[in-house]
Amino acid sequence: MVDYFDYKELLKRARSQLPEVVFSDVRFEIPSADSFVEGNRTIIKNFKDIAKFMERDTHEFAKFVMKELGTAGDMEGNRLILQGKFGWRMVNEKIQNYVNEYVLCPECGKPDTKIIKEGRIHFLKCTACGAMKPLKSL
């Protein structure tokens, strides 16, 4: 005897066997900045790791963070050393601003983007949906 299942029952059964991560819309979570204040300087210990995770140029990323914080800084190995005292929350907020502006696609919201240059203008090109957005220069 052949056992026939209702399509909705099969779908429900299949979905129940999948992990919760599959249904989550968030697949791109930036590691938080491991920063601390030392004297009159703020040091972000895992700065290069964050840039590598986002697949962005470290120097352009550092330039953005320094401009947003209104300070000078220097790369030293894996760390970014900023002149001035900045709290952990403020540093992470500036990193999130960078992600929203230069990493996430404005159309589909996916992080599968690349920065390309056409003429004198930089564009954020999404490899997932094909959308292109002109970027502000740093």
From Swiss-Prot:
Signal peptide: none annotated. Coiled coil: none annotated. Belongs to the eIF-2-beta/eIF-5 family. Pfam families: eIF-5_eIF-2B. InterPro entries: IF2/IF5 (IPR045196), TIF2_bsu_arc (IPR004458), Transl_init_fac_IF2/IF5_dom (IPR002735), Transl_init_fac_IF2/IF5_N (IPR016189), Transl_init_fac_IF2/IF5_Zn-bd (IPR016190). eIF-2 functions in the early steps of protein synthesis by forming a ternary complex with GTP and initiator tRNA. One of its GO terms (molecular function) is translation initiation factor activity. This is Translation initiation factor 2 subunit beta. HAMAP family: eIF_2_beta (MF_00232). Heterotrimer composed of an alpha, a beta and a gamma chain. Keywords: Initiation factor, Protein biosynthesis.
